[in-house]
Amino acid sequence: DCGIQTLLFMTLARLNGIPVHWQSGFDLKPGEDNLHDWCEMYLEPYGWVLVDQSYGIKNSRDERVKWFCLGNTDPYRWIVNDDFSQPLYPAKIYPRSETVDFQRGEVEWRGGNLYFDAWEYDYHIEYMSE
């Protein structure tokens, strides 16, 4: 799970004095769109750089490809969250379905929370070409 991997990476980085923060959203590669979690870490002199440990080090002889997921981003990433487990506004009355992320939203009614299997969401992606 990319969220657990990200939280583990962030914990290990912080234990070693490396500033990190959470990001999550959607990975919108054609044919592979899905929810996704990753983080950024602060590296002098570059500032905040993306780290996507879920994809790891690529098996490539090309060093640019091999290390791409450390400090680079692809054009298919849609950032929705810059932190995790934050309060919602307006506040929910019932417990949240997702306590860490907030990519797909939350739904509740006067009878309680509606977990993800009780409702659907959809999105349409239009890829632009030059």
Located regions from the model:
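Hydrophobic/aromatic-rich core segments of domains that either
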Residues: 4-94
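N-terminal accessory/pre-domain segments preceding catalytic cores
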Residues: 48-49, 76, 80-130
